[in-house]
Amino acid sequence: ISAEATPLSPFTPRGAYWAAQRRFTRLGRHWSTGVKLGVDTGFDSGSTLDYVYQNRPQGRNAFGRAIDRYYLDAVGWRGIRQRKANIGQAIQTATQHLREKGKPVHVLDIASGHGRYVLDALAAEALPESVRLRDYSPINVAAGQALIAERGLQSTVSFEEANAYDR
């Protein structure tokens, strides 16, 4: 077994740190909506990313919301929100260039999560000819379809369940 695969002893500083992190996560999920969502669906799931994009702390009480605020302010989640802004800017720039050349705009995202970052990037006054969102998770597809309906974009945006590695 390599050193990377050997469990850390809880009696070492690193082992104690990670053991405490696991305990705090298990405890925090009882109060913090974001931590619970991460534990339930995975911290890299589309549901968790959508929650992080919204950046609104929620919890069972003020203590839970404080935990959630701390969780949402983590440097990694701040980076994810910046990535969303960068993707939105890239979509808007590409759309502008295509429009200037008189070409149609079609957007495809093959691993959309809930699709919020694409939907947020769409300019209502100049919607693309089509937007096609895909994700493998039925939970993400249902949430994405609800966002599309909420924004009245059914005529332009579609969301289908499909694996990014399938054709």
Please tell me what each predicted stretch does.
Residues 137-139:
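Conserved SAM/SAH-binding beta-strand->alpha-helix loop
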Residues 130-135:
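Conserved SAM-binding motif I beta-strand of class I
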Residues 144-145:
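Conserved SAM-binding loop
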Residues 102-113:
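Conserved class I S-adenosyl-L-methionine
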Residues 152-164:
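Conserved SAM-binding strand-loop segment of SAM-dependent methyltransferases
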Residues 124-127, 149-154:
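Short helix-capping segments at alpha-helix termini
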Residues 5-99:
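Conserved Class I S-adenosyl-L-methionine-dependent methyltransferase catalytic core
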Residues 114-127:
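Conserved SAM-binding loop of SAM-dependent methyltransferases across substrates and taxa
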